[in-house]
C-alpha cells in the first residue's frame, strides 16, 4: 500500500505521464465510489481509496499502517489469516495466524491451543498427554476412549472396553489379575502422541495365549485357608506342574480334594504366564519413556497387592488333561 501526496504544483514529468489519463476515474475511491479531494490518497492494486475508507471488511477497524487485500476486499491481519490462511485449525476449521499459539502433530494436524480438545468428551488435552489421532476424520481424542465401544449385537463385539494399565518407575509394579472373560478381538494399532513420536498401542489380547479365553463356571467357589495356601505355594515354587502322585500327597497333607488342587495349579500357572506378558507390556512403554494410561476392569475390582491372596479364591474348572 502506498500513500500519495497531491501537490498544487506538479513536476513536468508527472504532467507528461498524465497525458491521456482519466484523472476523474483514477482519483475516485474504490470503496465509497466518491471523488477523492484529500491531500493523501491510499492506493492498492492500482485502486485509490480515501484515508477514512481503508477499513477491515469484517470488523471495520481503521487500517492506517498495514492492511491485507484479497479479491477486492480489505482485511486486517486477524481476519485475513482467519479466512484465507493456508494453514487451517483441525478443531475450529479456521485459519491460523503466524502469531497464534498452536499444537502441531506429526500427522500434519494443527490445532489452536483452545481447540486442542477431545472430539468425544470435549476435555482439553494437555501438552505431553498421550492421545488417539484419527487421520481420516482429522480429530483427536483422549486415551479414556480406547479401545472404542462396540455394539453388543455386532459379531465379535466386546461388552465393555478395557483400558491399558499405568506404571511408575518410582514404585514397584504390582501383579494385575487379568479378566479371563476378556476376548482377543483387538489388534495392535499405531498411534501418535502429542509430541509426534510414534508408539505402538497394544491391547491385552496381544500378550495373552489361548488359556486366556473365556471359561464357563461349572462349580462352586472354594476358599483355601492360609496354611493350605502356604503348602501349595511351596510346592509351586519347586514344581509348577506336579504329577498326579504329588497332587495325591498334597491332598493328604492339606485336606483338599485332588480336583481342587489340580485346578489351583492350573489357575496359578495361567496367572504366572499372564503376569509375565503384562510385565513385558509395561516394559515396552518404559523403554520408550511413555506412561501407559490407568487400567480398569469390567468385573469387581480385586486387591492386586497380594498375589497369594488373589490365588486363594478360584473356580473349579474342567481338567485340561
Swiss-Prot record:
Interacts with unc-86; the heterooligomer binds to the promoters of mec-3, mec-4 and mec-7. It comes from Caenorhabditis elegans. The lineage of its organism: Eukaryota, Metazoa, Ecdysozoa, Nematoda, Chromadorea. Residues 217-276 bind DNA. Transcription factor. Specifies differentiation of the set of six touch receptor neurons (TRNs). May positively modulate expression of both its own gene and also of homeobox ARX homolog alr-1 in TRNs, forming a positive feedback loop with alr-1, thereby restricting the variability of expression of mec-3. Required to determine the identity of ALM sensory neurons, acting by interacting with unc-86, thereby preventing unc-86 cooperating with pag-3 to induce BDU-neuron specific genes. Binds cooperatively as a heterodimer with unc-86 to sites in the mec-3 gene promoter. It is found in: Nucleus. SMART domains: HOX, LIM. This is Mechanosensory protein 3. Expressed in the mechanosensory neurons ALML, ALMR, PLML, PLMR, AVM and PVM, and the FLPL and FLPR neurons.
Amino acid at each position: 500500500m502506498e500513500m500519495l501526496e497531491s501537490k498544487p504544483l506538479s513536476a513536468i514529468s508527472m504532467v507528461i505521464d498524465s497525458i491521456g489519463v482519466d484523472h476523474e476515474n483514477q482519483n475516485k475511491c474504490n470503496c465509497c465510489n466518491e471523488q477523492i479531494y484529500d491531500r493523501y490518497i491510499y492506493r492498492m492494486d492500482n485502486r485509490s481509496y480515501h484515508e477514512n475508507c481503508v477499513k477491515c471488511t469484517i470488523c471495520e477497524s481503521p487500517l492506517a499502517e498495514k492492511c491485507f487485500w484479497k479479491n477486492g476486499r480489505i482485511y486486517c491481519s486477524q481476519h485475513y489469516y482467519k479466512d484465507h490462511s493456508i494453514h487451517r485449525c483441525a478443531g475450529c476449521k479456521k485459519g491460523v495466524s503466524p502469531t497464534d499459539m498452536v499444537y502441531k502433530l506429526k500427522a500434519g494436524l494443527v490445532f489452536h491451543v483452545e481447540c486442542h480438545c477431545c472430539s468425544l468428551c470435549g476435555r482439553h488435552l494437555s501438552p505431553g498427554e498421550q492421545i488417539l489421532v484419527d487421520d481420516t476424520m482429522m480429530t483427536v481424542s483422549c486415551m479414556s476412549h480406547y479401545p472404542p465401544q462396540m455394539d453388543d449385537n455386532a459379531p465379535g463385539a466386546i461388552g465393555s472396553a478395557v483400558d491399558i494399565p499405568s506404571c511408575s518407575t518410582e514404585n514397584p509394579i504390582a501383579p494385575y489379575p487379568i479378566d479371563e472373560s476378556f476376548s482377543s478381538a483387538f489388534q495392535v494399532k499405531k498411534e501418535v502422541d502429542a509430541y509426534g513420536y510414534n508408539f505402538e498401542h497394544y491391547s491385552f489380547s496381544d500378550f495373552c495365549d489361548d488359556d486366556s479365553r473365556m471359561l464357563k463356571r461349572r462349580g462352586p467357589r472354594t476358599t483355601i485357608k492360609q496354611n493350605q495356601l502356604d503348602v501349595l505355594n511351596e510346592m509351586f515354587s519347586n514344581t509348577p506342574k506336579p504329577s498326579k502322585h504329588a497332587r495325591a500327597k498334597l491332598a493328604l497333607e492339606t485336606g483338599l480334594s485332588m480336583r481342587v488342587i489340580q485346578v489351583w495349579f492350573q489357575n496359578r500357572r495361567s496367572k504366572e504366564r499372564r503376569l509375565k506378558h503384562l510385565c513385558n507390556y509395561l516394559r515396552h512403554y518404559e523403554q520408550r519413556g511413555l506412561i501407559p494410561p490407568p487400567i480398569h476392569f469390567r468385573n469387581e475390582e480385586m486387591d492386586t497387592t497380594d498375589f497369594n491372596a488373589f490365588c486363594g479364591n478360584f473356580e473349579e474348572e474342567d481338567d485340561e488333561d
